[in-house]
Amino acid sequence: SKPLVYDKLGFLPRRDGIGSFWFSNEERAMVHDELFPKRALIGEGCWWFNAQDGDNSKYKHFQGDKRFAMNDFKEAFTVSVTDALDSHCNTLDLRMPLQCKFWIEELPDQVQRFITLGGYRLYPDYIKVEQDHKTLTLFHSWKNYGVGVLPNNHPNWNYKYQVSFVLMNEKKEIVFLYTEPEAEPSEWLKGISYNYLSRFNIPAELQGKYTLCVGLTDKTKNNEAAIDLAVSGNLKIGKWIFVVELEL
């Protein structure tokens, strides 16, 4: 079924039972060896609050888990986050409302841990600009701080997100855009630097002061900056990232 489900129809793998033996060795190997990083993994935590009488304090099914040693609910839920990160999950469903309430009230640090480290967190790690009259040469390096991937290669998205540089005038209006064809965000994995060299000429009619910015644009929406990059807010102009002021 894999060639049909994943390759032809473009479905993404989803797995519940993250943080338990229900996520089997065979399935883990399939994710590691066959699916990731080409396919983003949609993860769901275990449904631990499943006591038939509603009293979850006495029903601790996780204590019988065959993979992880867990003594209480806090340990069980923390294991879910660790397992989700180790499995490169793009998402982690906290499951039913009562369980979500426990997460938020008792383990906000673990919720934040997945927000910070799970999925994709893309950012330009280094940008060097060289200007020769109307020609700009940019050396730029990108990283993914998250354990997952931006599924830009999914058939429904069809590589619509692209690395683009723009020039803004003093009114913050975009007057020039260049898209780097060699940079592909779906390839960016945690722990690796992705380096590119971009060179382009600026139209002769542009003269004066301009702001050079970079962003991940959506080619289906008039190349507007579409992805929130993991960069300090004081460098942001909307979803664009400030690079340098230029005099043309």
Question: What residue ranges belong to the model's regions?
Answer:
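Extracellular/luminal regions of secreted and cell-surface proteins that mediate adhesion/ECM remodeling
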Residues: Q112-L248
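Catalytic cores of secreted or luminal carbohydrate-active enzymes
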Residues: A76-I127
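Acidic, low-complexity intrinsically disordered regions
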Residues: I18, G43-E44, Q99, L138, ...
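Catalytic-core regions of glycoside hydrolase
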Residues: S1-L98
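Intrinsic disorder/low-complexity segments enriched in polar/charged and small flexible residues
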Residues: S24, F49-N50, E105, K190, ...
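Short amphipathic alpha-helical surface micro-motifs
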Residues: F73-E75, W103-P108, T179-P181, N195
